Structures are given as C-alpha cells and as structure tokens.
C-alpha cells in the first residue's frame, strides 16, 4: 500500500519497507511492473490493485460498522435505515422500501440495505477506477477511489463516517 522506504516516510510515518529491505522490494516492484517515481530509487507508484483493495476495505468496514451498531442498539432501526437509504436516488429508494415491506426481521432489512449500499459503492469505485485508469497506471492518481465517487453517495458515505466517529467508535459497548 505504501511503496516507499521508511527513510522517505517523513511526517506520514507510514511506509512499505525498511531501507534494509530495499533490494527485495526493488525485485518485487520490477516483477509487478511498478513505476518508479521522481527518479527516487526508493519510491514507487502504488500498484493499481491496491486502489481496488483499499476501496473494498473502506466500503466493507464502513458498512459493517453501521450494521453492527444497529445490532448492538447503538443506532436505532430508523437511524440505520436513514443512513443507508441516503445513498440512493428517490426512484431506487422507493424500490428498496417496497422490498423492505416484505422482510419482517429488522436485522434482515438492515442486511439487505447494507448489501445494496455495498453494491452501489462497488459500482461507484469501479467507475472511479475506469475514469482515472490512465492516471492510476501512470502513478499520478491522488487519493483513494472512495474520494472520487459521485456526490450523493459521497455525501452519504461522509455522513456515515461522521456518525461512526460520534456515536459508534465512542460507544461504551464498542470501547469495552
């Protein structure tokens, strides 16, 4: 994920390998076709697969945290539904609400919503990857794929992150 030496980590304090592992990393980077950046022998562009794995990680952790908070009763069913339905335009939201009417178990309703949001975010990140493929392959892409999704899901994702920070991660049930 961080294709540069510990000697270049600076303020980030995140790095991919120690200077003593430089030769091994060079061989791996060469084998994977990773692009060397700025003429630095110790800094490479991220492998394109890293962006997809990072997006999957971001999506799943965020959505599972919301679903788990519902199961732990940190979030009410209504709060959870509102958070997850915010990802969708009105027409799709209406279809989802119709589906929820035939599912009686609230945990199953939330699981359905969660999986619907995950599907939407996968599509958004796929689009972001394809829209930025040249920059990604050239090592010029900045940020994560999740930072390049369209406005409605981006706003909903940010709101989920804020709720997670304020209500979930600080909850006694989570901290204990």
Whereabouts are the PLM-identified features?
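Sequence-structural signature of the catalytic-core scaffold of metal-dependent phosphohydrolases
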Residues: 1-113, 122
């Amino acid at each position: 994920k961080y294709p540069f030496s510990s000697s270049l980590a600076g303020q980030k304090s995140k790095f991919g390998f120690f200077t003593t592992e430089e030769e091994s990393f060079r061989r791996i980077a060469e084998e994977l076709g990773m692009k060397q950046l700025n003429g630095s022998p110790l800094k490479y562009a991220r492998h394109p697969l890293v962006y997809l794995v990072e997006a999957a990680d971001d999506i799943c952790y965020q959505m599972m945290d919301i679903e788990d908070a519902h199961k732990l009763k940190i979030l009410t069913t209504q709060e959870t539904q509102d958070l997850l339905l915010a990802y969708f335009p009105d027409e799709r939201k209406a279809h989802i609400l119709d589906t929820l009417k035939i599912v009686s178990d609230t945990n199953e309703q939330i699981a359905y919503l969660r999986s619907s949001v995950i599907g939407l975010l996968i599509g958004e990140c796929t689009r972001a990857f394809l829209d930025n493929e040249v920059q990604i392959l050239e090592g010029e892409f900045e940020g994560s794929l999740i930072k390049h999704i369209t406005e409605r899901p981006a706003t909903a994702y940010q709101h989920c992150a804020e709720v997670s920070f304020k209500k979930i991660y600080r909850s006694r049930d989570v901290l204990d």
